[in-house]
Structures are given as structure tokens and as C-alpha cells.
Amino acid sequence: MTTSHQPQDRYKAVWLIFFMLGLGTLLPWNFFMTATQYFTNRLDMSQNVSLVTAELSKDAQASAAPAAPLPERNSLSAIFNNVMTLCAMLPLLLFTYLNSFLHQRIPQSVRILGSLVAILLVFLITAILVKVQLDALPFFVITMIKIVLINSFGAILQGSLFGLAGLLPASYTAPIMSGQGLAGFFASVAMICAIASGSELSESAFGYFITACAVIILTIICYLGLPRLEFYRYYQQLKLEGPGEQETKLDLISKGEEPRAGKEESGVSVSNSQPTNESHSIKAILKNISVLAFSVCFIFTITIGMFPAVTVEVKSSIAGSSTWERYFIPVSCFLTFNIFDWLGRSLTAVFMWPGKDSRWLPSLVLARLVFVPLLLLCNIKPRRYLTVVFEHDAWFIFFMAAFAFSNGYLASLCMCFGPKKVKPAEAETAGAIMAFFLCLGLALGAVFSFLFRAIV
């Protein structure tokens, strides 16, 4: 079959849909992560209300005694960021691993649509609970359960999406990575707007989570339109057929008909005519992509080890009592990270260096280890062991920008190159394996975040 027979991605519709799907995979986690101020404030307020209620219930003699000062921060809010990261990343790892088996047994449309609908329901519940008063402990537990759920379904969604993108040209992994980067930027801007509105915290949070629901609904609509596009259907069928069958199949697609032989649900296939040793096949694929897989794992171990659990504890040295104090973490930590992470991911759409077989790629990945001491020596408070070396806000912003850009660019390179180091028929499995190692890095980073915070 000649290249002239290949359909074109008209108006970049498939590219844009994959961008929206990438946005949908990380939007839930980013909205929860960026809203840490809302969650910790709710925990502190609930704790204070409980203490006041306890005081009022005492007898007159006890109430006449001086009341003990209320704690500025209760134990649940103090550990919220670390526990949130752990509850997010461990389910992400587990369900990404399960997805490497589920993708051969559960239709792609069920995995993707089911995950998006489940995430939408969790956000609707979150928005409703903004209006419901809860004690600190029940609120903490319910929040962690929701984080577990959105990341479990997010793992299935992400693994399915990278496997799906592995069947298309390499440039179609880039919009997923770029969309994921924009998810963080979108969440950061939404939170800054909520703060700037001057509304009550509960009102701002309600609008914030409803906005997330609207974006997820838009993502679902985009996915439902994907199978209607000729370009997408063409690449979906390539792995099902030998070269001799592809021209006949293309003619059917161009006429809007579905090929009848070897056709399963769009995006999912298990060819009965080509039995293989699945375990041996996965080992062979892993051997081919091992450097890239371990590279993406290391990238996210360092990233999640520091962000957000450690970086949100950095305090401004110049804000004083100005409004910059309220915006310092949303802007310097979340917005800066998400802008530069998105720029790094997006750059791979037009520029890919080093190549997939270059030794420079793993070398640059290992070099990111330098960001651990650089960020730990910023103005983190409270601190017990390390001294502050980089106190000024500008140092922290500069380190966050470089930290984020290198994360987005190098991770996107690894995810783009992984499925292209194996045969086209193995690309979906390679994409799922790469997604698993990405999530392994996230889980390891969540564990290391406790260590990194403890040594400060």
C-alpha cells in the first residue's frame, strides 16, 4: 500500500481530540492537588468547630477557666499533602498494572468511557460535599477515598489512551502529553481566579469543582466523536491485518463501512489466528523499551517526590502581610510548574532531541536528581535539620521552572519513543507498559516524598 492511500487528519481533528483526552486524564488529579488550600482549611475549620463545641458542652465551672488556645494546624491538615500523594499514586500504579491485562479483555470504549463517567460522578459528589458540614476525620477519610477512586479510574484511562496512541504515528502521543500539561495549567488558573474572586472559600470551591465537571463532559463528547473520523479508523485497523488486506480495508473505511474480518471493538483486538506466548511477548517488548521505561520511572520519582508534598511548604520571604502571601503557592508553585511542564511537553510536537537510542536521554534524566537538594534548600518551613540557602522567592521560582520544563520535555520524549521501538502490532502493549512505569515512578515518588520532607 502506498502512502498516497493513507487518509489525512483533516483539520487536525484526531490530534485535537487526543489533546482533549490528555487533558481529561490528569485534570481530576490536578484539580484535587491544586485545591489543597481548600481541603486543609476545611480540616482546620472542622477541628476548630469541634473544639468550640466541646468547650460549650462543659459545665459552668469548667467553662469559667481559661480556654486553651486553638491549634493553628491540626494533625490531619499537617499530613494532608503527603497522604494525598500516597493515596493518589499507589492506586494509579496498581490499576495501571491491571490495565496491561484488562486491555485485552475489556473493550476500549468501556475502559475509557467508563473511567470518564466515574471520574465525573466523583467530582459531582465533591462539589455537593462543599455545601455539607462534616467533622475533620470523616471529611479527611472521604476526601482520600475520592482521591483513590479518581486515580484508579484515571490509571485505566491513561493506560488505555497511551496504548491507543501507540497505534498512531509518533506525533500523536505528543498531544496527550501536552493535554496533560495543560490540565495542570487550567487547574492552577481556575484556583487563582477563585482566590481573586474574593468569594467565601466554599463558594469558590463549589465553582471550581463544577468547572472540572464541565471539562470532563466535554472530554466525553470528544471521545464519542473519535470513531467517526476516517484517519482514526484507518490506524485502528492496521494492526489487525497483513499488508495484503490493507488496501481492501481502506476502501471499506473510505466508504464508511466496517471491515468484517478480524474486527473487534474499536481499539481492542486479540487475533485468534496468531496465538502468541503473552508472557514471552511482554518480556521481549520490555527488553526493547527498558531504558525508556526506567527513564520515565526515574523522572516521575523525582518529580512527585518533591512536588507538591515538599514544594507547597515553601514560604515567601518577601510577601510579609501583602496579598502576595495568598498567591505565592498558587502562582510560584502550581502555576509555574504547570506552565513550564506544559511547555516542555508541547516542545516535543516540533522538536525531539535526543533520539530514542541516544545515551544523552538517560543521562539528562539522571541529571534531574540535582533538583532535590536545590529545592530542599529553599525557604521551606517548618524545618529542623537543613539550613536555608536559597531564601529569596526568585530562586524558588527559577528552580521550579527548570524542574517542570525538564519533567515535561524528557517524560514526553520517553512516552513518544517507547511504542516506536517495537513492531506496530506490539505498540499498544508497549504503550501500556510505558504507562505502567510512569505510574511506578509516581508511586515511588509518593513514598520518597515522606523521606524528602523529613530530612528538611
Swiss-Prot record:
Effect of residue 288 to Q: No effect on glycosylation
Catalytic activity: adenosine(in) = adenosine(out); guanosine(in) = guanosine(out); inosine(in) = inosine(out); uridine(out) = uridine(in)
Location relative to the cell: Basolateral cell membrane; Apical cell membrane; Cell membrane
Species name: Homo sapiens (Human)
Membrane association type: Multi-pass membrane protein
Effect of residue 338 to A: No change in the transport capacity but decrease in affinity for adenosine. Resistance to dipyridamole, dilazep, nitrobenzylmercaptopurine riboside (NBMPR), draflazine and soluflazine
UniProt-reported outcome of changing residue 193 to S: Loss of nucleobase transport. No change in nucleobase transport
Gene3D superfamilies noted in UniProt: MFS general substrate transporter like domains
Positions on the Extracellular side per record topology: 30-82, 131-138, 200-206, 312-323, 379-393, 453-456
Superkingdom: Eukaryota
Effect of residue 338 to C: Impaired protein folding and/or altered trafficking. Decrease in the transport capacity but no change in affinity for adenosine. No effect on the sensitivity to dipyridamole
Mutagenesis / variant outcome for changing residue 453 to A: No effect on subcellular localization and inosine transport
Record comment regarding domains: Cys-414 near TM10 is a major determinant of nucleobase transport activity.
Main location: membrane
Annotated glycan sites: 48
Result after altering residue 277 to Q: No effect on glycosylation
Name used for this protein in its record: Equilibrative nucleoside transporter 1
Region (Disordered): 254-276
Activation and inhibition: Transporter activity is sensitive to low concentrations of the inhibitor nitrobenzylmercaptopurine riboside (NBMPR). Inhibited by dilazep. Inhibited by dipyridamole. Inhibited by hypoxanthine. Inhibited by azidothymidine (AZT). Inhibited by dideoxycytidine (ddC). Inhibited by dideoxyinosine (ddI). Inhibited by draflazine. Inhibited by soluflazine. Inhibited by cladribine. Inhibited by capecitabine. Inhibited by clofarabine. Inhibited by ribavirin. Modestly inhibited by acyclovir. Modestly inhibited by 5-fluorouracil.
Transmembrane regions: 13-29, 83-107, 112-130, 139-157, 175-199, 207-227, 292-311, 324-342, 360-378, 394-413, 432-452
Organism classification: Eukaryota, Metazoa, Chordata, Craniata, Vertebrata
Result of altering residue 48 to Q: Glycosylation-defective
Tissues where this protein is expressed: Expressed in testis at the blood-testis barrier (at protein level). Detected in erythrocytes (at protein level). Expressed at relatively high levels in cerebral cortex, particularly the frontal and parietal lobes, and the thalamus and basal ganglia (at protein level). In the midbrain expressed at moderate levels, whereas in the other areas of the brainstem, namely medulla and pons, cerebellum and the hippocampus expressed at lower amounts when compared to the other brain regions (at protein level). Expressed in Langerhans cells and lymphocytes in the pancreas (at protein level).
Molecular function GO terms recorded: adenine transmembrane transporter activity; cytidine transmembrane transporter activity; guanine transmembrane transporter activity; neurotransmitter transmembrane transporter activity; nucleoside transmembrane transporter activity; purine nucleoside transmembrane transporter activity; pyrimidine- and adenosine-specific:sodium symporter activity; uracil transmembrane transporter activity
PANTHER family on file: EQUILIBRATIVE NUCLEOSIDE TRANSPORTER, EQUILIBRATIVE NUCLEOSIDE TRANSPORTER 1
Pfam families to which the protein is assigned, alphabetical: Nucleoside_tran (PF01733)
Entry-linked InterPro entries: ENT1/ENT2, Eqnu_transpt, MFS_trans_sf
